[in-house]
Amino acid sequence: CATLGGFIAHRGTGVLSTKYGKIEDMIMSMEVVTPTGDIINTLPVPRHASGPDLTQMFCGSEGTLGVVTKATMKIHPIPAARKFHAFLFEDMHGAMVAGAKLMTSRLQPCVIRLYDNAETAKLIKRVLGIERNGAYLVFGFDGEEAIVDLQMKKAVEICKETAIEDLGTDMGQAWWDHRYKFFYPPYMFQLPQAFGTLDTVATFANIENVYWGMKNAVKEQFPQATFIGHFSHWYDWGCMLYARFIIDEPPKDPSEAIALYNRIWDM
């Protein structure tokens, strides 16, 4: 469970952040009660030029500067259309090239989600039934249908430059329809498995180096663990890697299992 104040306190984000932004992009103003009992109301304006932005200062402060008691948020019209399309790429690099081009072309997708080959094999195959090996990429657009169709047409052209298979709109829609299924049994991790999750954002020029640096470190130092990752939040200049290390069969002794888990984190 979560609350609006919780979203603000930890700078939360959602599935459609690529178009609609994170919580700090959605908030206009807030009321905050400070540790001294003072009440601060930030200005309900889109931008200002009168010193530091207190609204942004409180976003992500995780309760250290005060408790958010009220918030004024942006609202958006419900889109007339929302459409999805999916592609399979031979490897993550080809998919990343396509994803980066979707963003630098300023097409404004509402979502892009790229799964590396390992996570495609481990989760996408099981949830969506894709049999072929590769890196799975899905994107979507929403808004007025005529505009969405134009955006989709150009995005499909971009992906066809490096993809090995056009999975079509049905497989894209299937991802949207089942996007929360990944977090429920039997698809989510179960005992005795152990795993850790890392969120890292970088520019398009560096994000693949970050990915391979993490993956190779886990592979070389901890052969008993596997590394999977997907890229879930995209920006004009880069994207976020949602990476996981997984220990399918940790040591049966709890102290040894905890020690192994902590060593991976400390790497």
Model-derived regions: residue spans:
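FAD-binding subdomain of flavoenzyme oxidoreductases
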Residues: 1-113
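C-terminal substrate-recognition/cap domain of FAD-linked oxidoreductases
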Residues: 77, 88, 94-263
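Double-stranded beta-helix
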Residues: 266-267
